[in-house]
Amino acid sequence: EMGAILAEIRDLGFDREGYLVHEPTRRRIDVVYERVDEDILYAELPELIDCHVEGKVHVLFAPNSEVVDDKGVEVFVPEMIRTYLGEEPLIKNAQTWSLAVPEERRYVMERFGELVVKSRGGYGGKDVMIGPEESRESIERFRRVVERNPTEYVAQELIDFSTHVLCEAREGSVVFRDSYADYRVIALAPDPKDPNVVEIVPGPLTRVAVPGKHVVNISSGGKMKDTWVLEN
């Protein structure tokens, strides 16, 4: 429906004028929505940088934008807003401690089993320990991993976030249960001449966790579901 091309890196190339093209169809590509590691993308398509700089293609995740995905950066975002924008943050961060900071590391290690400890570079719910949900043995095992390289980890308070009622069919009957849910609002800017015009899609991307767990990532057992906002 979008007319978008699903392509692998090997399907991409450049024409004589330096524009990115889809080799099988020779269609020029205007926008790249990358779902691979940027190091791999630019290593295999080094010309993409120049193409991007010259305005011949737009890349949804520009080079090095992954720095904002680093959970270690999140700790310092409120102070970055104050320093570089001269403003107070409008939305508060979840309380987060960086194990790269000695005082914060000591605090986290003293309360290790009470907190959520996660790798800065982890994704998909991997390399995360939710202390209150783990056994003592699992907590101690994860503690030893963290102690080997503490600067690569951050810790947060466990947030008891929203739940959503799920309807499941089991052996001919219907079962309702609560599950922790993560809602991702989709905001669109439809007017290229006025970036202040923003429309919110009335249905957030919703991920739900395995019963009794907080991790909603699909790769860690979570599921997707539909959610629709019927009224403002």
Predicted ranges, named:
Residues 1-232:
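Domain-scale recognition of functional cores that engage charged ligands
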